[in-house]
A protein has these predicted regions:
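Ubiquitin-like/PB1-type beta-grasp interaction modules and other compact soluble beta-rich domains
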Residues: 1-80
């Protein structure tokens, strides 16, 4: 299946692009997508451990099964101070 991944500004800056297209197995989860991104984009590896994933505008768990054509948005938590 194909999904689109939208990166937050900080992730896009580290990766050099705002969107990634992924080809995943039919039963893939958010965690599977994150593993594939880490393989393809080494600059994001350390940041992927703390991202907050969203699908269809809703925060989701890493165990959420994805569907073909969905957009997975990845945001970094905001730092307080």
């Amino acid at each position: 299946m194909q999904i689109s991944v939208r990166l937050s500004a900080a992730l896009a800056q580290a990766n050099g692009q705002t969107r990634i297209s992924l080809s995943l197995p039919e039963e893939a989860t958010v965690d599977d997508a994150l593993s594939k991104i880490a393989e393809q984009s080494p600059a994001l590896r350390g940041k992927l451990q703390i991202v907050i994933p969203f699908v269809a505008g809703q925060q989701v768990n890493r165990t959420k099964q994805l569907q073909s054509g969905q957009e997975l948005a990845l945001l970094l938590p905001a730092a307080g101070g």
